[in-house]
Amino acid sequence: MAIERKFVNDGFVKASMDEYFAEQLNRAGYGGMELNRTPMGTQIVIYSEKPGMVIGKAGKVIRKLTRDVAARYNLENPQIDAQEVKKPELNAQMMASRLAASIERGWYFRKAGHNTLRAVMNAGALGCEVVISGKLTGARSRVEKFVDGYIKHSGNPVDEVVDEGFAVAIKKLGTLGCKVRIIQPGVVLPDSYTTTEPSEPVTEPVEKPAEKPAAKPAEKPVEAPKKESAAKPKTPAVAPEKPVETAEVAEPEEAEEEPQAEVAEDLEEAEVIQVEGSEELRRQVNGVWQHKHEGYDYWHPMARVHKEAKE
């Protein structure tokens, strides 16, 4: 039981100290405190909208607070530090104190609640909830809630990411409780997720293998051209034509081979002779007599037997 009592006692000291600072520093815009116990002493950090009023002239106010805390809560060597809150709209305790002050000045509770909610959301909060409870408009007490954004109500995230502040507004009909709960901007919630669009696949260019240069064929040694012999080229053999059987010709003579290609020099040297009384032309080439006449207008051996036209 000793350990449990120690934790309960520490919680009581922290809660009562918070109420004491809120009462003493109401005009300075009190915004909460932090309590850290170290071997060197107890460090107390006070967050305020006007840290100059917390310190006082020549440190008069902060020295008085240090003496009172050491005497009330039996703390050894307490050290108090005052820090300024840069965005009061995101501090739940400050906004609850402002809401209570506006209601005490005579503002309608619904107008005061909406103004507080709008100021918190415009500061960039993820969510905000304003709860005003008490005798609002009649003899019976009731509760009015103003919610905007996203708010967690249960689980471990409530203790970690939700900032909560409370203040009391005193009116003629009775007291009104003003509670403000804020989720700070940039907080990562357990159920939050983000979706990313799939990126386009990057197609890498396919590199073609480098083509090897074709191997050059081995050059064959060039042979010197052989000298042509002085002999004249032979003419191709021509199949002999079958002799036409006639009564006048007893034995057919074999047709000589027809030269198809002749050397230009021999053709130029051959002399052409014309037979008297006819159009027949004759010449001698390589010892062979050739002629051409009517019906056979090309040079051919004279020994060739011509086919007679059938009647």
From Swiss-Prot:
Domain of life: Archaea
Keyword Ribonucleoprotein: yes
A molecular-function term among this protein's GO annotations: structural constituent of ribosome
Sequence intervals crossing the membrane: none
Region (Disordered) residue spans: 190-267
Signal peptide: none
UniProt cross-references to SUPFAM superfamilies, sorted A to Z: Prokaryotic type KH domain (KH-domain type II) (SSF54814), Ribosomal protein S3 C-terminal domain (SSF54821)
Gene Ontology CC annotations of this record: cytosolic small ribosomal subunit
NCBIfam families, per database record: PRK04191.1 (NF003219), uS3_euk_arch (TIGR01008)
Name of the protein this chain belongs to: Small ribosomal subunit protein uS3
Species of origin: Methanosarcina barkeri (strain Fusaro / DSM 804)
